[in-house]
Design a protein with these regions (language model features):
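Acyl-donor-binding surface of acyltransferase catalytic domains
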Residues: 2-8, 76, 80-158, 286-289
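Residue-level recognition of the GNAT/N-acetyltransferase active site
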Residues: 95, 231, 235, 264
Length: 289
């Protein structure tokens, strides 16, 4: 099948493509949605511009092409993730009152059919929504932003003395829930780009990375999302902002055109991005089917 853009575009409230995630508004076309259908016909291959290609050899989420609902007022795109006990998601692009009921029924049916333990509906809001919730999609435009190097105790990990580098393991263990234990394993294997670290009293207390730039769907250089965190006892000291600014400086001087981020609406990272002048592109949120 192929999507009709005159049906789909009016109900796409935020630039988000199933299995791909947020995309730059200039890249958002029916071709990206169609690409996900092509990927579903392969043996879980990645699209060349999929940000998750950095972390795995096979895609764990695919579009269930035969079960797509596509009509003028709504489009329902189901996906299946085989991670854990399995999750079916229905990406609901539509504003009709009955769309949620249709998405719920489809999610429940497909969860049973595929033996998935979870069934969810993914919904979207535009950037102007007064009740924005869930996850906000943020855009940093390096063509217009001014990103000077910050003055503070932040350097690439490999530029610190060996004794300081040795404290990253403890930091990663404390920040396991934020993904840093996984990242540290990737760092040890030499599989990732630079990781910027904040150090206090000879100890790593914050980090952001890896710093990597990849082409998007039309070849524009995009700074990839990073793991980002500061130890609880060092929050409120301005280290998060220092790390953030160092990352933005790195992206700009290394030739990235933009970065897309996802932040918890109303959370610390969301407030940081807002105060740093990023542009909100909309929201994604989910509910149990």
């Amino acid at each position: 099948m192929r999507f009709r853009w005159d049906w789909l575009r009016p109900v796409v409230l935020a630039p988000y493509v199933p299995t791909i995630g947020p995309v730059h508004p200039s890249v958002l076309t029916e071709d990206l949605f169609t690409d996900t259908l092509t990927a579903a016909s392969t043996d879980r291959w990645f699209l060349r511009y999929d940000k998750d290609i950095r972390w795995s050899e096979a895609k764990d989420e695919i579009v269930l092409v035969e079960d797509i609902v596509h009509r003028p007022t709504e489009t329902l795109i189901p996906t299946l993730s085989q991670r854990g006990a399995g999750t079916v998601k229905i990406h609901l692009y539509g504003i009709e009152p009955e769309s949620v009921a249709a998405a719920t029924e489809l999610a429940q049916t497909l969860a049973v059919e595929h033996g998935a333990a979870k069934a969810r509906i993914v919904r979207f809001l535009g950037p102007e929504a007064p009740d924005g919730r869930g996850t906000r999609i943020q855009l940093q435009n390096f063509r217009t932003a001014i990103c000077p190097a910050p003055d503070g105790p932040v350097r690439p990990f490999d530029q610190w003395p060996a004794g300081v580098r040795g404290t990253f393991a403890g930091f990663a263990e404390e920040m396991t829930s934020d993904g840093f234990a996984f990242l540290y394993g990737q760092m040890q294997a030499g599989k990732v780009g630079p990781v910027l670290t904040a150090v206090v009293s000879g100890r790593v207390v914050g980090a952001i990375g890896p710093m990597e730039i990849r082409p998007d769907a039309i070849g524009t250089p995009q700074l990839m999302p990073q793991y980002f965190g500061v130890l609880q006892e060092h929050r409120g000291e301005g280290l998060g902002r220092l790390l953030w600014r160092a990352a933005m400086h790195w992206g700009q001087v290394n030739g990235a055109d933009y970065q897309l981020l996802q932040t918890e609406a109303g959370g610390p990272s969301d407030r940081l991005c807002w105060s740093e002048g990023l542009t909100s592109l909309g929201f994604t949120y989910w509910q149990v089917a």
